[in-house]
Regions:
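Short, conserved clusters of charged catalytic residues that mark active-site
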Residues: 10, 14, 54, 86-90, ...
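Short, positively charged
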Residues: 44-46, 158-164, 191, 195-203
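Short beta-turn/strand-loop junction motif enriched in small, turn-promoting residues
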Residues: 57, 168-170, 185
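Conserved beta-strands of PAS-like sensory domains
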Residues: 174-204
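Extreme N-terminal signal-anchor transmembrane helix of membrane signaling/transducer proteins, especially
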Residues: 3-38, 42, 46
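Extracellular/periplasmic ligand-binding regions of membrane signal-transduction receptors
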Residues: 49, 53, 60-97, 101, ...
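Generic alpha-helical secondary structure signal
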Residues: 22, 43, 47, 61, ...
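Extracellular/periplasmic ligand-sensing ectodomains of membrane signal-transduction proteins
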Residues: 96-162, 167-176
Length: 204
């Protein structure tokens, strides 16, 4: 017996089939979208995490270079304590030979060199003039630069251990946003007589 299907039934069946196919297609697309979005998000997080790790490793390496530079220079500073004016050449060489260090100084305790006045802090720093880098020199300390009250001096002096300062704007010294690595210098009795510093710029 020959079956008979009306045109309407065929149309209706086609609609059902197409609707089912469309639903399946939409479900597949939604699953694919969710998977893709999740994958893209995970990839972005992994990339950001990797970038952060690389940056942290690079910064850590640079900070270690700054620390090592000062520690390796302590002996020559101690050797020249009897001639304070010669410290200028030492500080200038530190800044000139290390591109990470924009300024370096030695902040002596008040009246360490009585002939130099109450405060004495020789300080060398670099400035850019066009494409040329110039090393300048200052003697800091006084009412306009009361360094014994500054964190980079006071904290390592009290703790008798090296210290990285929080970022700050240095007026009178570097005149820029910087962080300072401070290394206490002690005499044979273990008393701090100066704070040896290296500044890194956070705005270059």
């Amino acid at each position: 017996m020959k079956a008979f299907f009306s045109p309407w039934f065929a149309t209706k069946l086609s609609i059902y089939v197409l609707s089912f196919t469309l639903i399946v297609f939409v479900c597949i697309m939604m699953l694919f979208y969710n998977y893709s979005r999740k994958q893209i998000t995970e990839d972005a997080i992994d990339h950001a995490h990797g970038l952060l790790q690389n940056t942290a490793t690079q910064i850590s390496g640079e900070l270690q270079i700054v620390e090592a530079t000062l520690k390796q220079s302590v002996w020559i500073v101690e050797k020249n304590l009897s001639t304070p004016d010669s410290l200028r050449d030492i500080l200038t060489a530190i800044v000139k030979n290390n591109s990470l260090i924009v300024g370096s100084g030695i902040a002596f305790i008040p009246e360490y060199y009585k002939e130099k006045g109450k405060y004495f802090m020789p300080y060398a720093f670099s400035i850019n003039e066009g494409e040329e880098e110039i090393i300048n020199f200052l003697k800091l300390g006084g009412a306009d630069y009361d360094y014994p009250c500054m964190d980079w001096y006071l904290i390592p002096k009290l703790l008798k251990k090296s210290y990285w300062s929080e970022p700050y704007y240095d007026t009178g010294g570097g005149n820029t946003i910087m962080s300072t690595y401070s290394l206490p210098l002690c005499n044979q009795q273990g008393e701090v007589y100066a704070i040896f510093t290296a500044n890194i710029s956070l705005s270059r």
